[in-house]
């Protein structure tokens, strides 16, 4: 099972926010997830990013691959260098 750390879109039309989740790479974007490790709200100024650092490091050490966007967010928070 290939596990990815990716964004799950939530919120209303034209008012999105995203949950940072761990999911099977074959599941749909807003489908079943394994774990939720944070959220990202791009509409606030500055953007609101909250990540559970311990959970993120645990999943990364277990082999979960972050998407390109999530990798940028994790760098901003300081989870990865």
Swiss-Prot record:
GO cellular component terms listed in the entry, alphabetical order: cytoplasm; small ribosomal subunit
Gene Ontology terms, MF aspect: structural constituent of ribosome
BP GO terms, sorted: translation
Alphabetized UniProt keyword annotations: Ribonucleoprotein, Ribosomal protein
The keyword Ribosomal protein is assigned to this record: yes
InterPro entries associated with the record: Ribosomal_bS16, Ribosomal_bS16_CS, Ribosomal_bS16_dom_sf
Keyword set includes Ribonucleoprotein: yes
PROSITE patterns per the UniProt record, alphabetical: RIBOSOMAL_S16
NCBIfam families: S16 (TIGR00002)
PANTHER family in UniProt: 30S RIBOSOMAL PROTEIN S16 (PTHR12919), SMALL RIBOSOMAL SUBUNIT PROTEIN BS16M (PTHR12919:SF20)
Annotated family: Belongs to the bacterial ribosomal protein bS16 family.
Protein known as: Small ribosomal subunit protein bS16
Taxonomic source organism: Caldicellulosiruptor saccharolyticus (strain ATCC 43494 / DSM 8903 / Tp8T 6331)
């Amino acid at each position: 099972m290939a596990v990815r750390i990716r964004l799950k879109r939530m919120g209303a039309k034209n008012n999105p926010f995203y949950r940072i989740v761990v999911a099977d790479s074959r599941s749909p974007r807003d489908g079943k997830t394994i774990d939720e490790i944070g959220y990202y709200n791009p509409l606030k100024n500055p953007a609101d990013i909250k990540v559970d650092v311990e959970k993120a490091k645990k999943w990364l050490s277990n082999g979960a691959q972050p998407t390109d966007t999530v990798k940028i967010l994790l760098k901003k928070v300081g989870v990865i260098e």
